[in-house]
Every structure is written in structure tokens, then in C-alpha cells.
Amino acid sequence: QDNYYPIGKSLKNMNENDIIIVYENTLIVVEVKAGSFTPDPAITNYQSHLRSYESLFQKGSMQCQRTIEYLKGNEEAIIYSQDKKIKKIFNMQNYTNIYLMCVTIDFLDVFAAKAEKISGINIELGTIVLSVDDLRVYQDFFESPFIFLNYLKNRSAATKVEQLKLNDELDHLGMYVFNNMY
């Protein structure tokens, strides 16, 4: 079930969020994106590819950012169900770790792993973009939620390193396994 929060103070117009995960003092805001990716080769139709990336990566990042702004902008941020019943009340002072995650259903690992570095796409630094398939790998790999949260901390920080352009999400995992704080 999606989450909803008001635009302004009225419940007449609501923004939507896919998933909010709470674990201890950590908050993970997730947007899940799917869509038809252009079948045209990038070499012949670059603009079509750029629009596909914008639709999958940039919009998800913007939705995550908008959700965080709402949560941080209200002392008691209320999240509603679609029928406008209160689902949860958030007090952001309870969270010391906040991660934004855009999950794509489409298999775009080569681009998702470095989405924040694609020219022409505006993704909030710190936002982790990955495929649902990579999440399944993480589910099998990480034995402890605390190790996974430490990985998210490092993975989020990696988005801010301009020189780091890995070609696959599992390259990020490999860097973490072999170098820990990469």
C-alpha cells in the first residue's frame, strides 16, 4: 500500500510515496519505478534514452526528496493511506540515518550503478539507484540488518564521489566487501 501526505495543509491534494522503511533510528524512503525503456539504440536516439532515464531515475529521486522534505518540514509528519486514514506519524528527531532509494524494475544495472553521474539527469546526491534484482542479491548476501545499513551508508556516500563510476551495482558491493569504507 502506498503512502500519502498532503500538499500544503489540505488533504484534498496529496503526494504519493511507495515505501518508507523504519529500522531502529534509520529511515529509508523508497520509490519504485517501472516503465517501457526505449528500444532505440542510444547512438541513433540519445534523447529518447535520456527521457527514459529521466522517467526511471530522476522522477524517483525527486519523489524521494519531496517525501523527505515533507517529513523534515513538519514536527509531526503524518503519513496517510489512500483513503486518508492515518498510517504513521513521524518525528524526524528520532532518526539519525536517512537514505533515499530509487528501485527500478527494469534491468538497467550498467546505468543504475552510476545514475547520479549521467549527464543530463538530475539525481539528488546520496540517492541510491538500483534494480530490484540487486535488492534480491542483497537479501541473500547480508546476514545482518546492521551490516546492510552500514553498506547503505557507504553506498550513499559513493554517489557523492565524482571520480567513482562503477559499471554494476555488484561492483559497489565488491568495493564494500574488499575495501569496506570505499
Briefly describe each language-model feature range.
Residues 1-182:
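Intrinsically disordered, low-complexity Ser/Thr/Pro/Gly-rich regulatory segments
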